[in-house]
Amino acid sequence: IVTALTTLIPDAEYGFATYDDYAFAGYGYSSSGDKPFILRQQVTDNTAAVQAQLTGVPIHYGGDWPESTMEALYQGAYGKGYDQNCNGVYDAATDIQPYIASEDDPFGGTGGQGYSATSSGGGELGGFGFRDYALPVMVYATDAPLRDADDSSYGTPGGCPRDAGFGDVVDSITALGGYAIGIMTSGTSVAQMEEIASATGSVADTDGDGMADDLLVFRWTGSSSDFRETVT
């Protein structure tokens, strides 16, 4: 994907993050390194740095079946951070740093930030460091249902400023002017991913009929190692 896009769009840049679930109530476990969003590489023009992060991702296990996809998409698009126990103090085991620290982030600007000035390329928008005037696109993949704070059938920790739900994801991606491309490895998440694509206008003409009305949700049937190779 990266190689093909670089040929078509020479100035395209890339970032990378992972997500498991909240380390709370058996959804995920801090002992396994589970978190709802982990920025691995901010948007950069250095594709080798992205490759290195993809290659070195450790195995996390989560707890129950759903995953924190909604929170991850929200943090990726919004980038304001998350304080799971609402104590205003950043806890590396459970919380998410804002991309850019400020007085109005959940830690009052004292919890650090995801942004690094040493990384080349990128910008300061969202939770990945999207560039001004670039088209932000988040490609996300999962094999599980999307834990949704707007759906009472899913439990969430009750963190600050709030646990992310479908509405937050749609609003943040829309405000960013971005797209979300979903990749599923099982049928359980299809409906939720299609709802996100529809609500954010993440559509294209993928069937060649001349109409940009196909939802950007795709099925992946290869291995995880194949996926890493395909991305880079």
Tell where the protein language model's regions lie, with residue ranges.
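Divalent cation-coordinating acidic motifs and surrounding scaffolds
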Residues: 1-232
